[in-house]
Amino acid sequence: MKNSFLFLLLLPLLLPTVHAASLPPRQMETLGRGVIAIKSEPQKIVVSWRVLGPDPEALAFNLYRSADGAVPEKLNPAPLTGATHFTDTTFNPAATNTYSVRAILAGAEQPPSARSVVATIPANAPARPYFSIPLQTPVGYTPNDTSVGDLDGDGEYEIIVHLTGRARDNSRAGITDEPIFHAYKLDGTLLWSINLGKNIREGAHYTQFLVYDFDGDGRAELICKTADGTVDGIGKVIGDAKADYRTQGEDLVPSRDPSGSVTTPDGKRMASRAGYVLAGPEFLTVFDGRTGAALATADYVPARGDVNAWGDAYGNRVDRFLAGVAYLDDVLPSAVMCRGYYTRSVLAAWDWRDGKLTQRWVFDSDQHGPADNTNPYRGQGNHNLSVADVDADGRDEIVYGAMCINADGTPRYSTKLGHGDALHVSDLDPTRPGLEVFAIHENPKHPYGIEFRDANTGALIWGKPGGTAPAPDVGRGVAFDIDPRHPGNEIWSTLPGLNNARGEIISAKKPNSVNFAVWWDGDLLRELLNGNTVSKWDWLTETTYLLFTAEGCTANNSTKSNPALSADLLGDWREEVILRTTDNKELRIFSTTISTEHRLSTLMHDPQYRLAIAWQNVGYNQPPHPGFFLGEGMKPAPRPSLSFVTPSK
């Protein structure tokens, strides 16, 4: 890579590091077995369950079925030691069948897994590949992005739903509806509702929400940006309930930005600020996961200040937000709230501990160079971010598009390749040490439209120029293992061709989607998730074929076609897909019924993957990746150092 396009701060990379094994284990949520039962055919129920991160490798299980509440019957003649996936064809379909597992430790059966609605098939239930969560969607609203956390400490996930009404992209003027959050148990019980109020604008770039156990009490909290008029889950108002800071009328201002602008008859480019919230206080609030009550509120950092300083006068770039969860010290996670990526970028790390919300550090690009494009840390952010321990010292770094920020808030490096729309961080190439980053970039003045770099140092491994006029912007790009003949992840984008992890073209053809992915069938390759379909790449015929369609469901975010959430939520190590129904009355959680020979711990006990689920709702949603290579020819998955807490009653 040419020196003029790479700015590396080498000093932090040369300092001695502490090996992760010498650090205390990360505290994570205590999960149950996550037993899930899917009636795939009239006389076929597929049951799967979790292997937990700390489980001994040789841990075996017995599987039980209870019909209409009778004494459970063991279904396996010998302990199950392989994949945690079982097909039951001997059940009575006229009975309500509930499944549970018991681990066998040192020859002794352990207590049964907790009873769960997702492990029960009602009598005479139809065959269907999902279970449903009924919603109480307000009129005019749509269930959009979701996240998960154990809100009540019972060892299973609850679902937090961001409900959207009228929304606007940051580049478009107009009044929006008030953002709403609902929290549901898996049986559809509504736990609470939070209304962010009229002073939080609705749109993909405004409300980034984090659901995680930040204080280590065994129960997850919700952290997000709030304002005057936000109503918490117990009906209390934050700030001034009557305040309304929305810009009224057109309020046209001069604009150099073609996005959202109009040209007047006299040739001036003007942009409307109608509906934008460009005044008034901004807050950051921690909400109790059990009740939705506001636990603490602080001023949002950074404040918007001079709107023009972020790149335009009408409110587009000033309100570009991102967020993530990161383990910045030895044990507990922090919330990292971010503002700006086209020009100035500010990241603020917050701790919620012992009932106090405190600021850990602030990174401000403009404190590391001039407020112009010669500053290597300005304009480097994406519409998304990733969190990973890139130097393997047990603490996380924030991969903020084309740059990386250390766990202590200092800059690690900048590639100076600028803004982009997609970002993938994992051990994408297992033939080389450490993690890699695959990213796309939209500025045609920069040398690479797609690039593959060392996540630790930022050093370019390979890159390729972007498109040519009239479409120089590389708008999409992904990195998934879809071809077993080549080590590591295959890589493709809106540019021609399918690349291997070394950047070599292995096919002139490529899959027909450049979006999400999901581990769905029984092998270690990843399948393609686009809209409400799961497909697979056939590397022999170089075609994509359909595996599954989620009938009656639709994806979110228009052409982005994202699921509400995709994650290893239940059952074995493969991933579930959450989609909303077309009438917006349900969330459906789809889980694979395809058998597998592979046994892996739940991906939710891989630290990087779990953090990816926390940030999946942010900006332009991106698929999650673990911190190790999961694919054809993989080595045994690493066993992370974790600790768990039993919540107090």
Enumerate the predicted regions with their spans.
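Bacterial N-terminal signal peptides
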Residues: 7-16
